[in-house]
From Swiss-Prot:
Protein's name in the database: Zinc finger and SCAN domain-containing protein 18
Alphabetical GO biological process terms: regulation of transcription by RNA polymerase II
Composition bias type Basic and acidic residues, residue spans: 214-231, 263-273
Cross-referenced CDD domains: SCAN (cd07936)
Length: 510
């Protein structure tokens, strides 16, 4: 038997057996390793997946660097050191499932960040129940459309989340800007689908006109107040013109003045071929004017008589009638007017009696201002008849010519610039145009101006009348002498033409 000391010393000197790992201890070590890896949120997981899927070849310097970068991005997404093979397969299947969802469902399901395929399927089923579209569960890209179910589908390669929808704190890690997804068609160009599309387009074109008519009928009409100023009725335009005339101070007392405005301009150039609307003296005056124009060429001044014949005092017409005829050359008696009809039915003897009445103010009213002749070298000037509107208005009111048809109503239209009065509104409008620089025709005998060439021709016939009185019978029988002879046979003085100017006295010429 060994001593006690030796017995206690032997175990102390013997080497201790090595500690072998037990199965329980190994499992504890494996359970402690995942706890050291930080947990990642679903948003971070989706962001790492997008970085791997959206990586492009141009971001690396070469093919080897590209492969190394892809390995690194794939490890950041799948994390093989922290997940098992089953977990990594779950991520790949989930990605494929979310990529083939319909467009109307996929953004909402991806925004929920499903962690497993079962959770993603339950989200799609719940959304289909809410939208009441059971056809969505068939997995058709267009929902419950039966037309698209016959086609061949392609995998959608766009990212599952748009950059604006991915709200992750790891976006600021400098991974680079994610490009916007491009629109990729779900359906490949299948011949059957193209044929069905052509049939639908043909039906749409056939139904196009009917739909267009319905749209036009249902479209509200434009309010009329937008374009009513551009499309006024003629009656409204006439009413506006009438109001303007009233604002200017014109008195439209004649009911037929508006209808005569259009016809009086035509009467200036168109005369009655039969001469029924003109007096006999007017027709004789035309023949006398022709003889005057043939005898005296243009530019030659007719000689004025130095002494007035004794018969001129009786043949002198009223001065008011002369001025009225010169200012209104286009006026002719209207056959529809009862007063004009009465004047046409008057006999020549009645007109001669009117002409024979002496004008009380003839001596003073007919003395006009002197206008110098531009070709006179010694300053001599021929006497002209004054064309001022005041003297014309006074003479028209004093002379018996104011009793003629058309003048019995007075002269309500007066010019605001010169005060000259007119019986017709159209004559006043023509007179207004003369103040605006309208061309005037001047008589070379007395230098009196007229607005119309016809009025100048009528005025030149009066000078021919005066010339025939001065020459007497030296030049043979003239139209004026024949008129005088015809008047003598009728029992009265020779008929004078309205608008004739008497010769001036000799002392006025000096």
């Amino acid at each position: 038997m060994l001593p006690l000391e030796k017995a206690f010393a032997s175990p102390r000197s013997s080497p201790a057996p090595p500690d072998l790992p037990t199965p329980g201890s190994a499992a504890g070590v494996q359970q402690e390793e995942p706890e050291t890896i930080p947990e990642r949120t679903p948003a971070d997981l989706e962001f790492s997946r997008l970085r791997f899927r959206e990586f492009v070849y141009q971001e690396a310097a070469g093919p080897h660097q590209t492969l190394a970068r892809l390995h690194e991005l794939c490890r950041q997404w799948l994390m093989p050191e922290a997940r098992s093979k089953e977990q990594m397969l779950e991520l790949l299947v989930l990605e494929q499932f979310l990529g083939i969802l319909p467009d109307k469902v996929r953004p909402w399901v991806v925004a929920q960040y499903p962690e497993s395929c079962k959770k993603a399927a339950s989200l799609v089923e719940g959304l289909a129940d809410v939208l009441e579209e059971p056809g969505m569960l068939l997995g058709s890209p267009a929902g419950s459309s039966s037309i698209l179910s016959d086609g061949v589908y392609e995998r959608h390669m766009d990212p599952l989340l748009l950059p604006g929808e991915l709200a992750s704190p790891s976006q600021a890690l400098g991974a680079g800007e994610i490009p916007a997804p491009s629109e990729t068609p779900w359906l490949s160009p299948d011949p059957l689908f193209l044929e069905q599309r052509r049939v639908r387009e043909a039906k749409t074109e056939e139904d196009g006109p009917a739909n267009t008519e319905q749209k036009l009928k249902s479209f509200p009409e434009d309010p009329q107040h937008l374009g009513e100023w551009g499309h006024l009725d003629p009656a409204e335009e006439n009413l506006k013109s009438y109001r303007k005339l009233l604002l200017w101070g014109y008195q439209l007392s004649q009911p037929d003045a508006a209808s005569r405005l259009d016809t009086e301009e035509l009467r200036l150039v168109e005369r009655d071929p039969q001469g029924s609307s003109l007096p006999e003296g007017g027709r004789r005056q035309e023949s006398a004017g022709c003889a005057c124009e043939e005898a005296a060429p243009a530019g030659v001044l007719p000689e004025l008589p130095t002494e007035a014949p004794p018969g001129d005092a009786l043949a002198d017409p009223p001065s008011g009638t002369t001025e009225e005829e010169e200012e209104q050359p286009g006026k002719a008696p209207d056959p529809q007017d009862p007063q004009d009809a009465e004047s046409d039915s008057a006999t020549g003897s009645q007109r001669q009696s009117v002409i024979q009445q002496p004008a009380p103010d003839r001596g003073t009213a007919k003395l006009g201002t002197k206008r110098p002749h531009p070709e006179d070298g010694d300053g001599q000037s021929l006497e002209g008849v004054s064309s001022s509107g005041d003297s014309a208005g006074l003479e028209a009111g004093q002379g018996p010519g104011a009793d003629e048809p058309g003048l019995s109503r007075g002269k309500p239209y007066a010019c605001g610039e010169c005060g000259e009065a007119f019986a017709w509104l159209s004559h006043l409008m023509e007179h207004h145009s003369s103040h605006g620089g309208r061309k005037r025709y001047a008589c070379q005998g007395c230098w009196k101006t007229f607005h119309f060439s016809l009025a100048l021709a009528e005025h030149q016939k009066t000078h021919e009348k005066e010339k025939s009185y001065a020459l007497g019978g030296a030049r043979g029988p003239q139209p004026s002498t024949r008129e005088a002879q015809a008047g003598a046979r009728a029992g009265g003085p020779p008929e004078s033409v309205e608008g004739e100017a008497p010769p001036a006295p000799p002392e006025a010429q000096r």
